[in-house]
Amino acid sequence: MEIRVFRQDDFEEVITLWERCDLLNPGVDPEVDIERKLTHDPDLFLVAEVVGEVVGTIMGGYDGHRGSAYYLGVHPEFRGRGIANALIARLEKKLIARGCPKIVLIVPEDNDATIYMCEKLEYEDRHQESVIFSKRLIVDQEY
């Protein structure tokens, strides 16, 4: 397995993977999301590749205060092999190198496998201390 930075020729494979992993949301065009990411900290957009196939992704961000991770997904046939752990670990290293003191992962509350993995990686469940609100500022064309 190789963890590397997203490349332009990964577009189709990544979007297909996101569809398989049920990571796409209504009103969010994944191509536009990727294009936006490529204009800001593209080196924090990582893919896991096995024998030339993209099997995992994580899209990180850092605003100078906190790090964040989105689009963490691993192809169903490749789960349980440590790929998500490796993606998170590589992102953490990149964020630490930038001086990032903390990272936030937002995981759907019904995703037991990812919650278990986060707990094993010593992430704390902080949902009782705050509520997450979001507001879509730009609605992409329906995907």
Swiss-Prot record:
CDD domains for this protein: NAT_SF
Record EC number: 2.3.1.-
Gene3D superfamilies: 3.40.630.30
InterPro entries noted in UniProt: Acetyltransferase_YpeA, Acyl_CoA_acyltransferase, GNAT_dom
Keyword terms: Acyltransferase, Transferase
Enzyme class: transferase
Any one GO MF annotation of this record: acyltransferase activity, transferring groups other than amino-acyl groups
Signal peptide bounds: none
PROSITE patterns (UniProt xref): GNAT
N-acetyltransferase domain span: 1-138
Family classification: Belongs to the acetyltransferase family. YpeA subfamily.
Name under which the protein is recorded: Acetyltransferase plu1384
Organism this protein belongs to: Photorhabdus laumondii subsp. laumondii (strain DSM 15139 / CIP 105565 / TT01) (Photorhabdus luminescens subsp. laumondii)
Lineage start: Bacteria, Pseudomonadati, Pseudomonadota, Gammaproteobacteria, Enterobacterales
